[in-house]
Amino acid sequence: ARTRLETAQISLNDCLACSGCVTSAETVLIGQQSIDEVRQELNDKRGRAFVITISSQSLASLAARFLQEKRYISKGILLARIAAKLRSLGFDVVADLSLARHLAVRAHTREFFARRAAKHIDGSFKLPMLASACPGWVCYAEKAHSELLPYVAATKSPQQVAGVLAKRIYGPQTLGALQASENCARDVYHVVVMPCYDKKLEA
């Protein structure tokens, strides 16, 4: 016998603010943190340090788009060319997301071993540990499967780690600060170039 499925019902509460459909909400989302907004901020720097971090996926897309002839180009050379252009537009620091990604993986590893050790001692931490750099997935878990939240890793994503690097290392170095502070962090404008609109959910 066939199982009769119930009719699915979708409400605005189910929206993940992704780029999968064209709605007024998506239009607002795309309009926020846009290229036009970045240009306006660059035209009014007010003594702030401007840091931009570019993901490897975005670098690959830029290489495919802007290389005039089909030939190999190393990631380092490509990033150097893009960095030169971005600095001419007003950015002080151009960074690759790879460092932040490696730091995030190491932090996830430490969290996993800490959870495993705690489970053997008092069972307080849940395993398996679910880890994802996709804020859309985390948003989905929060809205639709709250029972999974104890299993979701608390470690920062690569994009969040990049934000910490920008606010505490790259920015203060550019501003000439001896150490990072809250006031110094406010004087750092950080832009991240990522391949998905969902990344705006954690920006």
Model region roles, listed by residue range:
Residues 1-203:
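Iron-sulfur-associated redox domains of electron-transfer enzymes in respiratory
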